[in-house]
Amino acid sequence: TLYGAEAKYLAAQLMYNAGDYAAAEKEILNFIDQSTPHAYWLARSFILLSDVYVAMDKKLDARQYLLSLQQNYHADDDIEGMIQERLEKLK
């Protein structure tokens, strides 16, 4: 469900905010594996995964996820701005 997709994202966000990056990564990867039809929350999760990887000093992985999302996500919402903001910080 849409609310379930948002809940998975928010759970991972809470783990990230608490500094539990490994748990956040696991939660996001589990959500990705579920093949959700809710593209917005999936995209937000990929962005959060890039934040997790930056925190884990895996900046190359973070950048690759962002670039892939930039190429494959085409909705007219706030995702593109989030991607650009993070890519600028990774330069």
Regions found by a protein language model. Give the residues of each.
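Acidic, polar-rich low-complexity tracts and alpha-helical solenoid repeat scaffolds
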Residues: T1-K91
